[in-house]
A protein has these predicted regions:
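N-terminal pre-first-transmembrane soluble regions of secretory-pathway and organelle membrane proteins
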Residues: 1-69
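A residue-level signal for beta-strand positions that form part of recognition/binding surfaces
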Residues: 17, 137, 228
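C-terminal edge strands of extracellular/lumenal beta-sandwich accessory domains
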Residues: 22-32, 61, 90-101, 129-177, ...
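Short, charged, low-hydrophobicity "junction" segments
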Residues: 41-52, 82, 178-186
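Acidic, Ser/Thr/Pro-rich low-complexity intrinsically disordered segments
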Residues: 52-124, 131-135, 145
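Soluble periplasmic/extracytoplasmic beta-strand elements of cell-envelope proteins
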Residues: 72-74, 93-95, 141, 153, ...
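Low-complexity, flexible helical/coil segments
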Residues: 108-112, 173-180
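Exposed, flexible binding/inhibitory loops of compact, secreted disulfide-stabilized domains
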Residues: 177-230
Length: 231
């Protein structure tokens, strides 16, 4: 009987998900999507927390998806004051910009309460959205109307996911076989000084092309050939 009980306990414990949403805490330094962290695989589930101390503050992040994958987004608040007392037009505005540059403002379509046991916390869903993704980097911008704290979720895959710091040379290990530089890694160089980004690309063994340049800001295209550098 003891052996059977232990077996039952083991089975039940294995039914519990191995991962909850992985957290990302945005700060004032993440004042735009281009200055925010980059989720390498947008299918992986992350909860992104934004805390605003006054109106008209902006925080943002990015996530990479491949064509045909699903962009999944949730907007939540903790079920307590002041957030659960705010009118919809006083809550932070969430805007998603797709790789083609099309912007979409998330509309609040529900007010569904639920209990999240991992944090022993009650939340309220205000929006849940999904669509078939384009290939490239999605940018998420959150802008406050008043002092408020919110959480948004991207992705549904409950497994470990990688997050890159903005404008930072990534810790990239060259894989065996044909090398494909993921868009998220190239995106990580956006915002770096030209010389620093070129040095990073050289250190990692990348070939690159500057697609545009604005003072010290520029973006990389998918053409990484060294003989295709434009000034």
């Amino acid at each position: 009987m003891a052996g059977l009980l232990l077996a039952m306990m083991f089975t039940i414990s294995n039914l519990t998900p191995a991962y909850a949403h992985q957290p990302i805490n945005l700060t004032a330094t993440n004042s735009s999507a281009d200055k925010g962290p980059i989720i390498v695989d947008g299918k992986v589930s992350f909860v992104i927390r934004a805390n605003f101390s006054k109106p008209n503050q902006t925080q943002g992040f990015r996530a990479a998806l491949q064509a045909g994958e699903t962009l999944y987004f949730e907007y939540l608040i903790i079920d307590k004051a002041p957030e659960n007392k705010l009118a919809k037009n006083k809550l932070p505005v969430a805007t998603i910009t797709d790789p083609a540059g099309k912007k979409m403002v998330i509309k609040f379509t529900e007010r569904t309460k639920f209990y999240y046991p991992f944090l022993d916390t009650n939340f309220v869903y205000l929006a849940r959205y999904n669509q078939t993704a384009l290939d490239g980097i999605y940018k998420f911008t959150l802008q406050s109307k008043v002092k408020a704290a919110i959480q948004v979720v991207v992705g549904t895959l409950e497994t470990y996911g990688e997050v890159l710091s903005p404008a930072t040379c990534p810790a990239w290990v060259k894989p065996s076989g044909e090398v494909k530089i993921l868009p998220a890694y190239a995106e990580g160089l956006v915002g770096m000084k030209k010389e620093a980004a070129a040095s990073c690309a050289e250190k990692l063994g990348w070939q690159y092309r500057i697609g545009q340049e604005d003072n010290q800001m520029f973006a990389l295209t998918r053409d990484y050939r060294l003989d295709r550098i434009n000034d």
